[in-house]
Amino acid sequence: MTKLALIRHGQSAWNLENRFTGWWDADLTAQGEAEARHSGKLLAEVDADFRAGFTSVQTRAIRTMWLALTEMKRVWLPIEKDWHLNERHYGGLTGLNKAETAAKHGEDQVHVWRRSYDIPPPPLEVGSTFDLSTDPRYRGIDIPNTESLKTTLDRVLPYWQQKIAPGLIAGTDTMIAAHGNSLRALVKHLFNVPDETITGLEIPTGNPLLIELDPNLKPVSVRYLDAERAHSLPDLP
């Protein structure tokens, strides 16, 4: 069976501050770095031969991958970085404290923005402090100004099908270091999770989700490598 390891980046500075991060390039905290290294130590003990890796173009995911690979003694592994694996864009919520936003707009409204499948937050204003239109990593890209989980899946899925799935079908054990929502989108696709329940699936930081896939990329087993920090798992399809 081919193995796929999904790693949500370690704790970021804005995770710690309870802020909506999205596409903003918040870096890892010291705890996040430790989580990334711990992920690598856990993956080093897995009976797998990881030969390919993918990340977003966001620093917290890239550094999580590199710190994990360092512990695995696999820094030579070819890694492809692509914006299609970026976190969901939180639009006008970017940079806001989640608790303060709930106090201002009401918990019910913020819950809709955060947890509905197809309702995005208000768009980010052009020229905002968090406008990334001049960031060189996004040159030539039509950057979204907000996203729902559905539109996040709409950009993640073609990349999965074109770039990641072919290697897995060929039997290449693969690692992906990305973000809560881009990984949630992949889990939805792989496990056929319904729209109404996928938003409730929590993926912890720095705890690899190891999935074994058959030749048709159907999951046959799934587990978190750190059982003490594990969250609920999707049902096998």
UniProtKB/Swiss-Prot annotation:
Keywords: Gluconeogenesis, Glycolysis, Isomerase. Its EC number is 5.4.2.11. InterPro entries: His_Pase_superF_clade-1, His_PPase_superfam, PG/BPGM_mutase_AS, Phosphogly_mut1. GO terms for biological process: gluconeogenesis; glycolytic process. Substrate binds at residues 8-15, 21-22, 60, 87-90, 98, 114-115, 180-181. GO terms for molecular function: phosphoglycerate mutase activity. CDD domains: HP_PGM_like. The active site is at 9 (tele-phosphohistidine intermediate), 87 (proton donor/acceptor). NCBIfam families: pgm_1 (TIGR01258), PRK14115.1 (NF010713). This is 2,3-bisphosphoglycerate-dependent phosphoglycerate mutase. It comes from Hyphomonas neptunium (strain ATCC 15444). The lineage of its organism: Bacteria, Pseudomonadati, Pseudomonadota, Alphaproteobacteria, Hyphomonadales.
